[in-house]
């Protein structure tokens, strides 16, 4: 093989690798993922489709802000989002949306979220009901979740 053929082959190989890397990155971007499973719970991976679903079902929304590198997020997901009692309540009462604050920085900043984990509850008309900044053990999260449910009942009367 001549030196020119070697250079051309190397350039073609590099081009293929660059295109493959771009395609792989785009296939894993939140814009191409409709759902993400955290713990034992499935969430919409974007605000817009989750909000549309909440409007269609006339349900309140639970938005969970996280990042893949956040230790306290992983701990919350392993404990609270894997607990059957908690996940049953969340799935029955809310449309669930998860926002990766690194990949979806604007969504987080627009809602004044600057740390993870962070949770916001909205009623079915889109009014903010409660915020939970930071990690909560599952028992404390369950107490807070029940408080939110009570506030939702009162606001519907």
Stretches with model-predicted labels:
Residues 1-39:
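N-terminal targeting signals for export/organelle localization
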Residues 41-44, 86-105:
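Thiol-based oxidoreductase modules, predominantly thioredoxin-like and allied folds used
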Residues 43-59:
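A short beta-strand-turn-helix
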Residues 57-70:
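Short active-site neighborhood of thiol/selenol oxidoreductases, capturing the structured segment around
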Residues 67-68, 101-102, 124-125, 137:
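Solvent-exposed coil/turn segments that connect beta secondary-structure elements
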Residues 73-89:
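Typically the conserved alpha-helix immediately C-terminal to a functionally engaged Cys/Sec
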Residues 110-114:
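A short glycine-leucine-enriched loop at secondary-structure breakpoints
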Residues 115-156:
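Non-catalytic, surface beta->alpha helical segment in thiol-disulfide oxidoreductase systems
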């Amino acid at each position: 093989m001549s030196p020119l053929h070697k250079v051309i082959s190397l350039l073609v190989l590099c081009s293929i690798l660059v295109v493959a890397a771009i395609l792989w990155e785009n296939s894993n971007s939140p814009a191409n993922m409709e759902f993400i499973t955290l713990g034992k719970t499935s969430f919409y991976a974007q605000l817009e489709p989750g909000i549309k679903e909440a409007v269609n079902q006339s349900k309140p929304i639970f938005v969970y802000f996280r990042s893949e590198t956040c230790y306290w997020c992983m701990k919350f997901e392993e404990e609270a989002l894997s607990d059957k009692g908690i996940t049953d309540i969340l799935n029955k009462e809310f449309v669930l949306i998860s926002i990766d604050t690194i990949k979806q920085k604007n969504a987080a900043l627009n809602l004044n979220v600057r740390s993870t984990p962070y949770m916001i509850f909205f009623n079915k008309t889109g009014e903010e009901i409660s915020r939970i900044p930071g990690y909560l053990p599952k028992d404390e999260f369950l107490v807070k979740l029940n408080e939110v449910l009570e506030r939702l009942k009162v606001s519907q009367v």
